[in-house]
Amino acid sequence: MAGSRLETVGSIFTRTRDLIRAGVLKEKPLWFDVYNAFPPLREPVFRRPRLRYGKAKSPTQDIYYHEDQIRAKFYAAYGSGPKAFDLFNPNFKSTCQRFVEKYIELQKLGETDEEKLFVEAGKALLAEGVILRRVEKARTQQEGSQVSRKSESMGVESQTALEENPPLKEVPQAQHLESPGEESKGLSPP
């Protein structure tokens, strides 16, 4: 049993105790008498971890603020926007933060309808000079411009436009910066 590696059968104390009784171990380990005098409240026995299916539940609850719901609505409607966060400026406020502040300011004035508050906060930012573009409209405009390009390429109107403006000549990919009189001196071109 000494070389069986059955760590799962019992605790280290019970296995050591049995080895001493069988005469395999001649001397007691230093910790054996201490463990015997002060046994733990729960015996340390190996247990296989249960298989978990699905997402593991976190022991802490997520903290949501009212502002987070406003931000989620803002990003769903307007996206992150073209302007990046300026992390070097400690007084920088993102468009979303300015929107949330306007939303809360209008809410304190007594408005209760969330949709109306959302629209009014957008209008207030527009009055300050911040232009908000809805994500859905931008996507449909891009798709619409692609469709119009495809339809134009098949029509006669685009052919006449090509005849008026001849296509540009292709520029070679590898351009040498050497003057015509200079020869390359055994070096391969870049």
Swiss-Prot record:
Pfam families: MRP-S23 (PF10484). Residues 137-190 are annotated as: Disordered. One of its GO terms (biological process) is mitochondrial translation. The modification N6-acetyllysine is found at K102. Component of the mitochondrial ribosome small subunit (28S) which comprises a 12S rRNA and about 30 distinct proteins. The keyword Acetylation applies. GO terms for cellular component: mitochondrial inner membrane; mitochondrial small ribosomal subunit; mitochondrion. CDD domains: At1g26750. Disulfide bonds: none annotated. GO terms for molecular function: structural constituent of ribosome. The modification N-acetylalanine is found at A2. Its main location: mitochondrion. The modification N6-succinyllysine is found at K83. This is Small ribosomal subunit protein mS23. Belongs to the mitochondrion-specific ribosomal protein mS23 family. InterPro entries: Ribosomal_mS23_dom, Ribosomal_mS23_met. The lineage of its organism: Eukaryota, Metazoa, Chordata, Craniata, Vertebrata. It comes from the Eukaryota. The keyword Secreted does not apply. Transmembrane segments: none annotated. It is found in: Mitochondrion.
